[in-house]
């Protein structure tokens, strides 16, 4: 099975089981309380999996995180977002939003896991930050 086929199957299976949850987001010190969320992606690379990607460009050197948020929408609307991930227009759809920030904290009482690049790394609360110019690359 291709990477795209596997990602699509996992996405559909996850949507079938998932229920939106209420979260508090602290974005650079400002709190947005009781937001009903289906999905939140914090990224520095617009590619999700296989050929899926977000259409919001990111500057990898600006010290800011890109955040794509899908509000608590119906399972049918979530399923309809899948094709938009393949043509890069998911964050233009109703019920989604995009923002950039230097740091972000996710707070919730729901029992969920935090997944990063396919690995389960913990449970909320979660704080996301980025260190500007922290990685030095030597070529040659």
Model-predicted regions and their roles:
Residues 1-140:
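Long C-terminal subdomains/extensions of small-metabolite kinases
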